[in-house]
């Protein structure tokens, strides 16, 4: 079988010391590895110098906003419960949500949280997932009311590889400066590097566009089948404004900031769907057909994200750059350094 289709072909070893538990401060001082595909050139610089390397292109950002999706409560017996909200079921008659619950629960069990919030376990699903319903003062909560309540009692859902509790600093650090549409349970991390000053400078030379893709917990889901074509990609809600669609439909060069932007642009390029659910899986045998350049962080081994990067530059080249980044002590994952692919 073609090695590009084998899960084991996307593996690498990373020392724990290179996993960033906090962002660089100031954030634009993060390091940036630049790879020019045309000339096969590699540059090591800092993120604040990004504009020095950018060609004439439109820049697309994901303006999703991370909700405080992790809450702690109790069973009626007093046993502790941790719930991680994934997403709403948009087509259900009653407001129902998909959630992951740590702790054994039964169907129809009631769980108790702060601010008189109660949860009824509606259905037990696979992989520790549960279909749940939220109540406050015995009134069913819809998505908007739930998100408002979570803002008061919830915790920022840091990724599983950050081995610490969320802190006050994460409220700002794990949210992009242009985040506005609530619904993500993970940040589009390439966006986290941008400061207001950097954004202002970019606007002077580049057209800036926003789209929304609510990053789901599936972004952390590991690929488990050796033939990656058998992997069932997670689905996430997206919306693209008309003006952004027109740029995608044009021949204007595009820089996508982050893998979520890439998947949204490429889904639209294939389907002409402006709003819906994106489950596009990009890899070397299913490469991008529209986006020209990519800005992204360094991703987990054997993840769909490293496969997406490989779709741009080839699997072997991707692994070589990761090997170089490890040698040069770049910081990895959500709070880590960045890579620009031209």
Swiss-Prot record:
UniProt source species: Campylobacter jejuni subsp. jejuni serotype O:6 (strain 81116 / NCTC 11828)
Gene3D superfamilies cross-referenced by the UniProt entry: QueA-like
Subcellular location(s) of the protein: Cytoplasm
GO MF term (any one): S-adenosylmethionine:tRNA ribosyltransferase-isomerase activity
Keywords per UniProt: Cytoplasm, Queuosine biosynthesis, S-adenosyl-L-methionine, Transferase
One example of a Gene Ontology biological process annotation: queuosine biosynthetic process
The name this protein goes by in its record: S-adenosylmethionine:tRNA ribosyltransferase-isomerase
Organismal lineage: Bacteria, Pseudomonadati, Campylobacterota, Epsilonproteobacteria, Campylobacterales
A GO cellular component annotation in the UniProt record: cytoplasm
Protease among keywords: no
Pathway given in the UniProt record: tRNA modification; tRNA-queuosine biosynthesis
The keyword Transferase is assigned to this record: yes
Principal location class: cytoplasm
Superkingdom, taxonomy of origin: Bacteria
Enzyme Commission number(s): 2.4.99.17
Catalysis performed (reactions): 7-aminomethyl-7-carbaguanosine(34) in tRNA + S-adenosyl-L-methionine = epoxyqueuosine(34) in tRNA + adenine + L-methionine + 2 H(+)
Gene: queA
Assembly mode: Monomer.
NCBIfam families per record: PRK00147.1, queA
Residue pairs linked by disulfide bridges in the UniProt entry: none
SUPFAM superfamilies: QueA-like
Family, per entry: Belongs to the QueA family.
EC primary class: transferase
Function: Transfers and isomerizes the ribose moiety from AdoMet to the 7-aminomethyl group of 7-deazaguanine (preQ1-tRNA) to give epoxyqueuosine (oQ-tRNA).
InterPro entries hit by this protein: QueA (IPR003699), QueA_dom1 (IPR042118), QueA_dom2 (IPR042119), QueA_sf (IPR036100)
